[in-house]
Swiss-Prot record:
Family: Belongs to the proline racemase family.
Regulation: Inhibited by pyrrole-2-carboxylate in vitro.
Gene Ontology molecular function: any one: 4-hydroxyproline epimerase activity
SUPFAM superfamilies attached to this UniProt entry: Diaminopimelate epimerase-like
Organism listed in the record: Acetoanaerobium sticklandii (strain ATCC 12662 / DSM 519 / JCM 1433 / CCUG 9281 / NCIMB 10654 / HF)
Top-level class of the enzyme under EC nomenclature: isomerase
Residue numbers annotated as active site: 91 (proton acceptor), 256 (proton donor)
Protein name (Swiss-Prot/TrEMBL): Proline racemase
Gene it is expressed from: prdF
Sorted UniProt keywords: Isomerase
Length: 335
């Protein structure tokens, strides 16, 4: 046997949404900042993403991250998130998964009842409180980056619907278009997942053609990357139910941590949520995240919040992926 590359990764899922976490076997990722490292991956090491996210090793809805070093003295490590379509600046479910893996595999020393971890992503520093009981991670609470309502009641003509829709654009680590399902004439149900995917990608691409967004402090964040469609909950314990569409038509199986942060910021700015008030977001699969507003802050001229998201993650496998130089599909493929 002769292989040109061997990549080590740990698989986990956070409330149903996968995270394949690369922990070794790739070249050094150069860059002073995490945004620089993200750009270096895009330009020089994108085969890692395509090989692990795409078939035959992955699938259309695979999600992952790469653990790397950070130049931030507060951070235990750096993290860069990825999916089938590219790289993300922040991911809530991915942060919960990475924190769980870091503690349960000994990357970070386990401390009961709470292990504190700081991770740096391109969007900023993520603080995680890992709840540990009998040497097992029970749940993780992440303090996300400052989140804010960027544009309220935006309008967009959607050709496939033959109508103009109204929605909000909010930041929760990435920019989200947040749309009530009734605006689209759909329900957030697994039986409607195909139409939800189609509409989500159509709307995201139209927004990026028609509407300019720019994070006031992070120059590299200037597109709406995800569409969050929300509805009334199925579970009486939940406040709302959602589905997030991203990448190349991927469907988040979890309630989406960054999407929950963006929703918290939206509700708080509109006066529909108070500091420390209970908020529960249900996913299209029925799993749930707890969210709360910790405090107010500012991002440039925008009123913002510091959100906390709580959920659970579980390790599902330890992988040593190999790449055969003679394999015509060695770096993955999509259909």
């Amino acid at each position: 046997m002769k292989f040109s590359k061997g990549i080590h990764a740990i698989d986990s899922h956070t409330m149903g949404e996968p995270t394949r976490i690369v922990v070794g076997g790739i070249p050094q990722i150069n860059g002073e900042t995490m945004a620089d490292k993200k750009k270096y991956l895009e330009d020089n090491l994108d085969y890692v993403r395509t090989a692990l996210m795409h078939e035959p090793r992955g699938h259309n809805d695979m999600f992952g991250s790469i653990i790397t070093s950070s130049n931030n003295k507060e951070a235990d490590f750096g993290i860069i998130f990825m999916d089938g379509g590219g790289y993300l600046n922040m991911c809530g479910h991915g942060s919960i998964g990475a924190a769980t893996v870091a503690v349960e595999t000994g990357m970070v020393e386990m401390v009961e009842p709470v292990t504190n971890i700081n991770m740096e992503a391109p969007a900023g520093l993520i603080k995680a409180k890992v709840m540990v009981e009998n040497e097992k991670v029970k749940e993780v609470s992440i303090t996300n980056v400052p989140s804010f309502l960027y544009m309220e009641d935006a309008k967009l003509e959607v050709p496939s619907l033959n109508k103009t829709i109204t929605f909000d654009i909010s930041f929760g680590g990435s920019f989200f278009a947040i749309i009530h399902a009734k605006e689209l004439g759909v329900k957030v149900e697994t039986s409607q997942v195909d139409v939800l995917k189609k509409l989500g990608i159509e709307i995201r691409d139209l927004i990026n053609e028609k509407i300019k967004v720019q994070h006031p402090e992070l120059e590299h964040i200037k597109t709406v990357d995800l569409v969050e469609i929300y509805d009334e909950p199925s579970n009486p314990e939940a406040t709302y139910k959602n589905v997030v569409i991203f990448g190349q038509g991927q469907v988040d199986r979890s309630p989406c941590g960054t999407g929950t942060s963006a929703k918290l910021a939206t509700l708080y700015k509109k006066g529909h949520l108070k500091i420390d008030e209970k908020f529960v977001y249900e996913s299209i699969t029925g799993t749930m995240f707890k969210g709360r507003v910790l405090e107010e802050t500012k991002v440039g001229e925008f009123d913002a919040i510091i959100p906390e998201i709580t959920g659970g993650a579980y390790i599902t496998g330890f992988n040593h992926f190999v790449i055969d130089p003679e394999d015509p599909l060695k770096y993955g493929f999509t259909v």
